């Protein structure tokens, strides 16, 4: 199995806005739920390929990605209740999991899915 390329500053080529779910007033006494951008971070997006689950997801119009961001005070607050938006393309990704892969608080790896409602 080939080794994955390690993330570095040069590989963080995408600008991703991370959005948390918020509630607001709809003006008629009701509540509107939506997403509001919390911060923007550079990230690396790598399509997931190969296994049976990934192939099944593609057949349903969803593409899973691994998103890598630098670990910092803000990115450590990301949860699966959030969504990510590519600032360049406008594509929205549902966040499925956030993991500190190197356990040294250098990088956070997010499993995200394009084409699925957050």
Feature annotation, model-predicted:
Residues 24-25, 30-118:
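Short, conserved turn/kink motifs that form compact alpha/beta structural patches or helix kinks used as
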Residues 1-31:
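Active-site-proximal polar cores
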């Amino acid at each position: 199995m080939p080794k994955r390329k390690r993330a570095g500053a040069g590989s963080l080529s995408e600008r991703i806005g991370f959005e948390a779910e918020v509630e607001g007033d709809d003006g008629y006494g009701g509540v509107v739920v939506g997403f509001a951008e919390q911060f923007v971070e550079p990230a690396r997006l790598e399509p997931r390929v190969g296994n049976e689950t990934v192939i099944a997801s593609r057949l349903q119009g969803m593409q899973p990605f691994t998103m890598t961001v630098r670990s910092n005070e803000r990115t450590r607050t990301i949860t699966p209740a959030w969504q990510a938006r590519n600032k360049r393309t406008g594509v929205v990704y549902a966040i499925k999991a956030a993991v500190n892969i190197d356990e040294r608080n250098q990088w956070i790896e997010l499993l995200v899915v394009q084409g699925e409602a957050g």
